[in-house]
């Protein structure tokens, strides 16, 4: 499976795919934070780092004489994506920010870069994640633009953290995206005391 992870951070999506026993052939990552990229490179040296999402360009080269064409990501070469994943910045969407600008904000408007690349690359599947606490208006805009319905999953079902997030999951069918419906995970009942370690190496302290 070929994966493109946008707003990749420290490549937690790669960790999740590995834990799900999904074979990853090629993993491309778009991330601009140098510290996050450094961690990703240390843990997964095989990941291809593409840099700033706003500078990623996809093009089709067509040979008019032979009707052959090739799909390329500028600077990378042939590009065939099975899964596009990403969680666009939420600072302008979350209720944690008082004067939030919604999808017009400088950071949260990067959602439209996700959409641009999805429409250019036509991946077989895509997953977009964002905060559940956004306004109904912004939630509906994202839903309408992506063309699929979201599902809300609380990380508390599988971890010791209350973290409600929306996931829009789409599958390409006849050149259009359809909603992929999934079941909520079972509640594992994990508490903070279940994951805290008593003896931790000092190198992990700041």
Q: Where are the model-predicted features located?
A:
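A structural micro-motif
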Residues: 1, 24-25, 46-47, 123-124, ...
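Exposed boundary/loop context
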Residues: 2-4, 79-80
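SAM cofactor-binding core of SAM-dependent methyltransferases
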Residues: 3-57
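Class I S-adenosyl-L-methionine
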Residues: 59-83, 88-206
């Amino acid at each position: 499976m070929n994966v493109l992870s946008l707003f990749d951070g420290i490549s937690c999506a790669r960790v999740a795919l590995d834990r799900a026993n999904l074979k990853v052939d090629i993993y491309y990552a778009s991330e601009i934070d140098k510290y996050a990229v450094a961690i990703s490179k240390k843990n997964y040296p095989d990941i291809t780092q593409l840099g700033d999402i706003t500078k990623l360009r996809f093009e089709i080269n067509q040979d008019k004489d032979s009707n052959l064409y090739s799909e390329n990501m500028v600077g990378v070469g042939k590009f065939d994506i099975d899964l596009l994943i990403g969680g666009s910045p939420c600072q302008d969407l979350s209720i944690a920010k008082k004067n939030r600008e919604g999808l017009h904000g400088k950071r949260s408007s990067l959602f439209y870069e996700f959409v641009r690349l999805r429409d250019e690359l036509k991946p077989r599947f895509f997953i977009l994640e964002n905060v559940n606490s956004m306004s109904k208006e912004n939630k509906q805009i994202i839903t309408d633009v992506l063309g699929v319905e979201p599902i809300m999953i609380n990380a508390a079902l599988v971890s010791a953290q209350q973290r409600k997030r929306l996931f829009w999951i789409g599958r390409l069918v006849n050149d259009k995206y359809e909603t992929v419906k999934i079941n909520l995970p079972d509640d594992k009942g994990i508490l903070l005391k279940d994951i805290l370690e008593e003896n931790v190496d000092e190198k992990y302290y700041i």
